[in-house]
Amino acid sequence: MTQYFDEQPTVPSDRRIVVWALPDGPLTITTDRGVFGHGTVDAGTKLLLLKAPTPPQPGALLDLGCGTGAIALTMARRAPASTVWAIDINARARDLCRANAQRNEIDNVTVAHPDEVPDTLRFAAIWSNPPIRVGKDALHDLLLRWLPRLRPAAQAHLVVQKHLGADSLQRWLIDHDLPTERIATGAGFRVLRACPADHSPAGHDS
């Protein structure tokens, strides 16, 4: 089966629309096969968006592994003076995220392949429902690539399913100079808040 972390999904398209009522207004999302969250907004994403604090603004924000864009669009709506970078290696996901931003009339989202993000860009916040099923080594590489790019005192909020290793991931982050605490639990998921130590090289945030 084609996985949602493939660059070019080969599974036939089957687009479905989801309307999700959030406290700050409804969000209409087109989903598709080959992209995480087909036909639904998953419970982990819901928990993250209900429990994460309002994103800072102005500045650059990051949705790591954007999928259909539910997280990125919510960040953008809550922080209209910020620019949200929605990144994913999956080309179908990027297309959906762009279309969903347009559908919801949200214009402060930049959708990109991870390699298109400027090396000097630093983020005021990162939100992510990371691709746990990509494998432990690949996941660790992903987090070590992006979390150190937070601005000083900035935070990352990650949602991870408990039975897929949320607690062990928290310990691993702490062991890698990424102090992390659990801020919420629900529906079998944990929301983790990571506040990396200030060792990032200088960069810009817009």
Regions found by a protein language model. Give the residues of each.
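N-terminal auxiliary segments of SAM/dcSAM-dependent transferases
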Residues: 1-22, 34, 38
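Conserved class I S-adenosyl-L-methionine
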Residues: 161-176
